[in-house]
Structure formats: structure tokens, C-alpha cells
Amino acid sequence: MTATKQHKKVILVGDGAVGSSYAFALVNQGIAQELGIIEIPQLFEKAVGDALDLSHALAFTSPKKIYAAKYEDCADADLVVITAGAPQKPGETRLDLVGKNLAINKSIVTQVIESGFNGIFLVAANPVDILTYATWKFSGFPAEKVIGSGTSLDTARFRQALAEKLDVDARSVHAYIMGEHGDSEFAVWSHANVAGVNLENYLQDVQNFNGEELIDLFEGVRDAAYTIINKKGATFYGIAVALARITKAILDDENAILPLSVFQDGQYGFNEVFIGQPAIVGAHGIVRPVNIPLNDAEKQKMQASAKELKAIIDEAFSKEEFAAAARN
């Protein structure tokens, strides 16, 4: 960890449900000293209104400069957070959003780079693993300075679901979801533990709990977004707090280990793809990935997830408007 400057600046691109919830989380938690909110021209006044509304909470939290921003404001930002994109509708998978959101992502990243920005990108728009890869390609940045929210929310859901079943605090449950933030994600059961006790051993002392319940629990975690979208139209609170946690780790140079969408350089037998795994993150971005030794079944799931993402990337970047970036 290194000494960090006192004034931390975040630019948020996208003031929809996720973006505005993230901004609210930053204000509530006293994260960053400056927050600029960028929206498309026809929604600029909404960003102005949200900035004003959020500023009225500052007397209860901590000082912060909050305003509706423009892309030139990215020049001296420490972090640009991208939540903008077409929302996932009922019946859609995250991967269905690829075509719509790649073009949006290219426009955003191009304008951020033109400002002279040299900080860190944090991507949350879906499909997040694909769009993190796209941000890396469109920006030309080193891979360690481009981070996706990855399986951070999935992991939080997993820990909370286990905690509820076991009647313990979720913060005492240590377990990860890895792979795609989506349908091919998987639970790393082999290393799940409660306060250091292997989950399998811990369950021996828990009555009326069987293996089938674990399968149902994981499926509930994997499909949680669909459940929420069908009931209320979108998910935003959980991912907003996950983004706030990642933001704090970066701005405070914590060297925290978080499950993120990070660049693969042979860690699990594949390259040139961003996918969810634990990684050390601090002021300069990804310090290094943390490679959990997966069992054979988990390795197969990780490789299948990566293969699916790679196929989608190759198809998407074969299109003329994105092909030049793919060759860089």
C-alpha cells in the first residue's frame, strides 16, 4: 500500500437506478470528496436534480462536492464508474444485452479517454465481463486499471443465503462465486467455510440440513437477479453497495481481496478474457489475482464459463464497428 492523496474524485457515468443508488451509497458512507455525475444530454437535468438532492444529505454525513458533470471533468478523476447501459428486461439474460451495450460502452470510453483521464475504470453495466473487456480494448489501458464488478454481488448473495440457512452473521461466512456474472457462474464449495471451519464439516453440527438444500440455495443465488427483475423491474441496491465497497478499496488503497471481473493471463488455462475471481485491489487497480486452487469439477465450470464469454467476445468484436479495437 502507498500514501494516497487526500482529495479523491469519482466520476459516475449513468444516473439510472444503479448509478443513483451508487451515488447515494457514496454519500451515506462518506466515500470520496468529489462526485461528478454524467448523463446523456436529454437527461442532464436529472443529473442536476440528483446532485442537488444528494447534496442535501451532506450535513448528516461528510463534506463532498457533488455536481452534474461533463466528460471533460474526467481528466483528473481517480475513478470512472460506468453503470450506463440498456437495462435487463424480464426474460432477458445479461448476455442478450451485448449488442445494445457495446455501442454505448464504446461511446462512453472514447469520450472519457479524450478528456485525458488516466485513472481506473470500474465497470458495472451488463454483461459486465464482456463490457469490462470492451472497456479495456476501447481505452487501451493496462488490464490492471480496468476492473469489472464481476461476481462481487453474486458472492454477497451467496454468503447471505448461507448465513440465513445457518443462522449466523454473513460476515462470518467465507465463500465465493466465480466465473461469469451470469448463468454460467458457479459456487466454490471446496473452499467455503464458516469462521475458518470447512463448510462440509460445519454442516455436520447443523440439524435438518442436507446436500439438496445447498443445490437449491446456489440456484437461488444464481437466479436472484431474474427473481428481483420479475418482481420490481430491476436490481440496484445490492450492486450499488458492492460498487461502493470496491470504490473504497481503490480510493483508500486497501489491498482488499474482492471477487471482481479481472483479466486472465493463463491463471486457469485461458487468456484474453475478463472473468470473476478474487483479486487484490488498491489505488493502482488490480495488484494481482488470487488463484483459488479449484477442484476438478470447479475447474471445468470455470473453463466452460470462460469459453462461453470468449465465444461471445469473438463474435461481437468481429463486427466492423468493433473490429479495430479487437486488433489492438
UniProtKB/Swiss-Prot annotation:
Residues at which substrate binds: 88, 94, 126-129, 154-157, 235
Reactions it catalyzes: (S)-lactate + NAD(+) = pyruvate + NADH + H(+)
Gene Ontology terms: biological process: glycolytic process; lactate metabolic process
Modified residues (Phosphotyrosine): 226
Described function: Catalyzes the conversion of lactate to pyruvate.
PANTHER family: L-2-HYDROXYCARBOXYLATE DEHYDROGENASE (NAD(P)(+)), L-LACTATE DEHYDROGENASE
Record family assignment: Belongs to the LDH/MDH superfamily. LDH family.
Protein name: L-lactate dehydrogenase
Protein's organism: Streptococcus mutans serotype c (strain ATCC 700610 / UA159)
